[in-house]
């Protein structure tokens, strides 16, 4: 017997390619999207939303296709065997053993179901906050990375286990046509200056006005009241928004840009870097990071590296990374569209790691942490990718190799090296005989590891 269990807010149109009735295949089994849920997390300026699709599999069981840091996670319910720890015992960053596998807590925060549509399993309390905790598999290779979610909206808590997926790998059909997606009223007037603002991406949760650069929150859709913040001191991106470039064989479009400031906890000096949000319809999102010591391309990870040595080392995908920097970060300026509710003044604590050309970065708040992984890029490669070879000199950073000076230059370098060794020896002798020396200054720059650039949109549930 069906009965009315409450009244919900109307679903806001997130203009996703996904829709009810769309179908696909995973692990040799078909599925059809039959239900849609929208959740909210955070409060005030930190409020964000995500969408979760209920998938009915051909064997009659349920699964979920959910947003995850600009990508997707496909999750299935699993039995907890009564072993789910209380949410209070799962602080963010905590490592925990579950079912013989080690996980790291990536998110622990209250969420609220705000809207639902279609065929759905038992729903959490309507409009009432409940806690969702997400843990990500620790270490291992990329193919084995998993997301485990605990939904404390029911008793006992519901548990789902998922892995990262790409929509094109799911052989999906019945998706919204691109023309329908693009023509569905995605333009609105800027709440600050009245100029038209066009939203181009389905996943956007924040956007800036192209005229006055006001930052506008889209987390509640564009039909309601739009929260906004006027931005001063504009920062010009080196690569223009809308530019398309090919990096590592993949075509990316620049859809967002943010300038960030960092400061070591034991240092008064700050440093800055910029991050370009890149988008590919088949691959999702990535970050092109422009830092003092070079360029890098990074993407959020599904799992979490295994951190050892009191945070000094991180093991990921068969490699051991060493920590390069730890610092507080703050977003100072943004342009374009973003899939999370970015704002000026957002603060995180970051740690960067590196091994050779590969890099890892951890970004953490009180309720969430996000890992990203990638590699360094040559500045010429970045300039060529976006057809800016004539401006390549502007892309050069501290990691760039010196220009060849020929035989004479080689001799000069050898002389300089010898002089440096002599000076080092003199300094060592002076130190041995009681000479004192002062510590060096703080003229270091942020690693090019690339912090993720804001809050993630979650994992198995988000």
Tell what function each PLM region has.
Residues 1-18, 22-410:
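Short, surface-exposed polybasic-aromatic patches that bind anionic ligands, especially phosphate groups
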Residues 187, 374-462:
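Low-complexity, glycine/proline/serine-enriched intrinsically disordered segments
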């Amino acid at each position: 017997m069906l009965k009315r269990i409450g009244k919900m807010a109307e679903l806001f149109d997130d203009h996703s390619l996904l829709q009810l009735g769309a179908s696909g295949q995973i692990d040799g089994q078909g599925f059809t999207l039959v239900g849609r849920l929208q959740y909210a997390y955070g409060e005030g300026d930190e409020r964000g939303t995500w969408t979760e699709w209920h998938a009915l599999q051909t064997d009659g069981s349920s699964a979920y296709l959910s947003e995850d840091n600009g990508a997707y996670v496909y999750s299935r319910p699993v039995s907890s065997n009564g072993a789910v720890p209380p949410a209070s015992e799962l602080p963010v960053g905590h490592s925990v053993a579950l079912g013989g596998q080690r996980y790291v807590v990536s998110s622990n925060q209250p969420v609220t179901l705000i809207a639902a549509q279609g065929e759905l399993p038992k729903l959490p309390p309507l409009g009432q906050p409940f806690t969702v905790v997400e843990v990500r598999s620790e270490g291992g290779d990329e193919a084995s990375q998993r997301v485990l979610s605990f939904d404390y909206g029911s008793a006992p808590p519901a548990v789902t286990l998922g892995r990262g997926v790409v929509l094109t790998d799911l052989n999906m059909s019945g998706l919204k046509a691109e023309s329908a997606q693009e023509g569905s009223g995605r333009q609105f007037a800027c709440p600050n200056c009245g100029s038209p603002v066009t939203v181009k991406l389905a996943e956007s949760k924040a956007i800036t006005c192209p005229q006055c650069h006001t930052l506008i929150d889209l987390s509640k859709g564009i039909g309601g009241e739009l929260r906004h913040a006027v931005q001063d001191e504009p920062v010009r991106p080196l690569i223009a928004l809308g530019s398309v470039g090919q990096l590592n064989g993949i075509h990316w479009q620049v859809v967002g840009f943010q300038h960030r400031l960092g400061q070591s906890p034991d240092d008064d000096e700050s440093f800055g870097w910029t991050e370009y949000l890149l988008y590919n319809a088949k691959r999702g999102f990535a970050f092109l990071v422009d830092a003092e010591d070079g360029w890098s391309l990074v993407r959020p990870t599904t799992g979490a590296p295994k951190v050892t040595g009191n945070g000094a080392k991180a093991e990921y995908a068969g490699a051991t990374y060493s920590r390069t920097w730890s610092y507080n970060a703050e977003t100072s300026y943004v342009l374009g569209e973003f899939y999370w509710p970015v704002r000026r003044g957002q603060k995180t604590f970051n740690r960067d790691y590196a091994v050779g050309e590969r890099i890892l970065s951890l970004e953490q708040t009180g309720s969430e942490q996000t890992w990203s992984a990638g590699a360094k890029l040559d500045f010429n490669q970045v300039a060529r990718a976006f057809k800016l070879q004539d401006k390549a000199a502007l892309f050069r950073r501290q990691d760039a190799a010196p220009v060849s000076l020929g035989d004479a230059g080689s001799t000069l370098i050898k002389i300089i090296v010898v002089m440096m060794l002599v000076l080092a020896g003199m300094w060592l002798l002076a130190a041995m005989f009681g000479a004192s020396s002062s510590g060096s200054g703080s003229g270091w720059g942020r690693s090019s590891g690339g912090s993720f650039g804001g809050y993630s949109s979650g994992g198995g549930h988000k």
